[in-house]
């Protein structure tokens, strides 16, 4: 069932970043049901959702870093005017948009008339790429922000800490690259066919 997080009751957790969410039995029964293929791998479904979350967080981290670089003054001008910072932002941009495209492919895995059925290979690509980007983007974001990015009062750490947690959720990039590699080893045709299977979709969300 599709449960609205806005309707949930939240409770703080001692060892987790996010609150524990609970719904009443009435809310659960009233929530719309989505029919899912019985053979669906739950980890694959979870990974597709987490990849989308990561893509959004990566974009937010990049936008915050870009804004900070344009506002922070050093030596009489914004630090974003320095070539070293521009290079870091360019690298971040590459990873952020690559992760976004991969997550879109993972979420557009298809519908067979029986419910949501993610394509495992597309999801593997999405989760692996987003997890890989999380390391690079988080590191560069904190490098650009300096010490302020590590403080509890500054919002950057709310995103980067979750990116590191989500990187391991439903399998890290090492796990999903292994899934993709296994699919490639068992494929009997051309490698290009695998690439087409991942990237050729009718509509990218």
Pin down the residues of each PLM region:
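Alpha-helical interface subdomain recognition
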Residues: 48-205
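FAD-binding core of flavoproteins
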Residues: 1-63, 67, 191-205
């Amino acid at each position: 069932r599709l449960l609205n997080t806005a309707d949930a009751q939240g409770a703080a957790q001692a060892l987790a970043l996010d609150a524990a969410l609970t719904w009443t039995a009435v809310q659960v029964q009233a929530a719309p049901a989505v029919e899912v293929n019985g053979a669906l791998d739950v980890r694959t479904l979870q990974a597709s959702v987490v990849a989308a979350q990561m893509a959004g967080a990566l974009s937010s981290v990049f936008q915050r870093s870009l804004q900070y670089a344009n506002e922070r003054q050093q030596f009489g001008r914004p630090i974003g005017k320095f070539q070293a910072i521009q290079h870091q932002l360019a690298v971040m941009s590459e990873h952020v948009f690559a992760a976004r495209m991969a997550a879109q492919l993972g979420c557009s895995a298809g519908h067979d008339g029986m419910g949501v059925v993610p394509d495992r290979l597309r999801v593997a690509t999405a989760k692996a790429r987003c997890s890989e980007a999380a390391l690079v983007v988080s590191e560069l974001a904190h490098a650009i922000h300096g010490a302020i990015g590590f403080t509890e009062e500054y919002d950057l750490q709310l995103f980067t800490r979750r990116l590191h947690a989500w990187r391991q959720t439903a399998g890290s990039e090492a796990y999903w690259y292994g899934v993709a590699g296994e699919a490639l080893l068992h494929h009997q045709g051309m490698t290009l066919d695998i690439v087409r299977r991942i990237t050729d979709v009718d509509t990218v969300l």
